[in-house]
């Protein structure tokens, strides 16, 4: 048997003692009925001229057809303007992070000699290129490329299968281990070499404390919640660290062949009907789920921090409703109305922010990595020539612009590597073999154009 507390009985007695024996009037209900009747009357009055006008326009088929054509033209123009607006906005949203990632890589390559020294190779590229024979070196680079692409293909298919069968915990654990390695071990190596290069003295406890704070905040921002800009900064940083590892441990010829092969693989994996990346994107769209933030750079919130803010706001409003003074009905009504208005405003603000968040453009971290590998290799192997590095940088941005243009036209997921990498390879070899010797000849003869 459930029994109310004594305080609740007292409140009920006080509440009932305030009510008279007569049936109270219901002004709010009657006013609402009158208001609705007035609205219906005014609505009918306003609609009468329109109905007569429509009756007059029905015989005139040309006028109605012209109006329909004008409305369709207006809608098409608005869609084109919206596409151009958000297309330009998306270009700017991607130019900044891609540029920052490449700048970090190039600055590190130019200043820290550790990442240009060849003292080992990746396990995925077992064939060495330390030979004078061009044919043997080319063969080894092709074999290394085949092994590397095969590993990427197998791991991608494995990831797609895990996602298809909803093995989310395994995927999260896999990504968390990768992020831990990047944010702690690779960051330690990077900071150690930077401090050695610039002769900065730091004791190990302080260094470990810095790395611990950096890695812990990064894990929280990437895999849980955090400010959008901080999450983006961490994604850019781990992409740069991974690119530096590839630049150091990939053989020179193998790196260029891998860049060409990975662009072809990206094209097939995204556009083929049974491509692994296409299946991953389609599965995520069917389930209406975001792809894991550790794999995708997003210019909009994926696990939005607004969710926490809205939950906090809802909690505050619930607390306001729970702390209503039941002894004052007028104050209770006003507080409930204020809470309802606040909730409506919060929902309207969230709904107004949702379209911008949905329009955010997303780019895979692999694209960041291979863009930076291309520019970093150009900076490391082009005899320190800035013309070649800048040419590759411009080529990647041009390819990214064209990719975003195609994205606005086709409105579906497209590979971001083929155009940019193709332009980058063309600009690299043409600048390194044609422009650089020409500039050196002009400089040796003290001729300036």
UniProtKB/Swiss-Prot annotation:
Lumenal side: 112-141, 191-203, 248-252, 384-389
Pfam families the UniProt entry points to: Presenilin
Residue intervals on the Cytoplasmic side: 1-90, 163-169, 225-226, 274-362, 411-414, 436-449
Domain notes: The PAL motif is required for normal active site conformation.
Catalytic residue list: 266, 367
Organism of provenance: Xenopus laevis (African clawed frog)
Sequence motif PAL, location on chain: 415-417
Family statement drawn from the similarity comment of this UniProt entry: Belongs to the peptidase A22A family.
Protein name: Presenilin-2
